[in-house]
Amino acid sequence: VFRFAKDVIVNNNEVIEEQERMAKLSGMKDTWTVTAVKPKYQTYVVVIGESARRDALGAFGGHWDNTPFASSVNGLIFADYIAASGSTQKSLGLTLNRVVDGKPQFQDNFVTLANRAGFQTWWFSNQGQIGEYDTAIASIAKRADEVYFLKEGNFEADKNTKDEALLDMTA
């Protein structure tokens, strides 16, 4: 009983500290200096997939023809990317942010860089969102001009939400 009570208190304190850290991160201004912007295209789309091995996807060299759009689209596919960490949150933190001495600088991320360069930014997610800045990735998302989460609550909030529903948000 004592250990359970102690664990509850410790875990609760860790959650509170993480929420305070996320709120602090949300207020930090980016430090990007953009010297020139010469976009080749009017629209850029970045699709971030997770929890899928590239050898299971045809567009990335897999043996199955299961990615017809990605296999035929006129775009750049990073087929040799290796996750920066074993967990999604840490990997995306190291991938989407500027990293200094091995630590992600959450205020300097690819969304704030695009904003600073004058692009209009949108973030669509099929992940859950518990609070405004519940994770470091949500704090990146919230820096976009337009932000839409399909799910409210944790990532299991509505397991039946299909990625295709993200397309409805673009109409």
What residue ranges belong to the model's regions?
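Active-site-proximal alpha/beta segments of enzymes that process anionic O-linked groups
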Residues: 2-46, 51-171
